[in-house]
């Protein structure tokens, strides 16, 4: 039997970047990605605020199921020096689906994507192995929490954000 496929897979897995140290406590890696109009938006432009960097995609069922929870948290905490930056891992031919999902799920905060799917520059920067995934960045650009979902999102925001 031909084991070239297995051999190739082993090589790919060996070359896959290993997650660096835990992101929490680190300075959030800087990135700039285009918004739907093509305007470049950088993470550092949110300095001075707490920002939830939310990695998702229109084709991701678990992301879409989590979106109402994120919308609720945004409504509850946006007045406490908090915002969200949505980073979509949609593909080039998926821009329309991305825009429809933003409208349908009522994601009213800033959205960006290079439409490069898993080839997006942010994937290795943040060691993203699956979505939905997020990091909470403090006003100085430091990651203070990650992978906040469900009740844990609101609970953590309530603890961390200024009253």
Spans of features found by a protein language model:
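Generic structural signal for well-ordered beta-strand positions
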Residues: 41-42, 144
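Thiol-/selenol-based redox modules, centered on thioredoxin-like
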Residues: 136-163
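Short active-site neighborhood of thiol/selenol oxidoreductases, capturing the structured segment around
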Residues: 42-64, 70
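Short, internal strand/loop/helix patches
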Residues: 29, 34, 99-140
